[in-house]
Amino acid sequence: EAAVEYIVNNYKGFHSETRMLKDALKTADNAIATKGIVEYKCSMGTTIALAIVSDYQMFYTWQGNVRIYLKNNNGLSILTSDHILNVGYGQTRVTRCIKGTGLREDIPVKVIKLTRNDNVFFCTDGFYNIAESMLSNKSITENKKAIIKPDDDVSLIQVNL
C-alpha cells in the first residue's frame, strides 16, 4: 500500500522509473517497520512486486518469492526469479523482502517492451505453486474457480493491455 501510494503521489514529473521503483520499495520498508512496531508491537515482513507501465514499456522490481509472468503470442514466460534459499528437508527461506530493516543496494529493476493484448500476471507463491500451468490457458475467472482451499495465501493480479 505504501509503495503504491508513493508512486501515485510522486510519478508526475519524475524522470526515472528505476529510481521511482527503488524509492517506493524503501518507502514500503519504512512503513512496514513503523506499522509493525506501533500497531502490533512486533517485527513484520512481506514479499512484494511492483511495476510501472508507460508507453508499452514495463519497469518492474520484486523482493522475495513473488512472480511476474508475461503472456503474449510467444506463450507464457516468467520475468522474475525467486529470492529464496533451499535450507533442506523441503524447506525454503526468503532471502529478500521488505521488513523494516533496510534493503540491499542491488535491488533488481528490469524493463520489458509490451504490445497490445499482452497479459501480465503478478502471483504470490501460494498461487504459482498450485496453478502456474493454468495461467497460459485460462482466464482469471477460471483460475479463481479452480482454487478452492489452498495451503497458503493466494493472490493473483492480471493486467491486460
Which residue stretches match the model-derived regions?
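PP2C/PPM-type serine/threonine phosphatase catalytic domain
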Residues: E1-L161
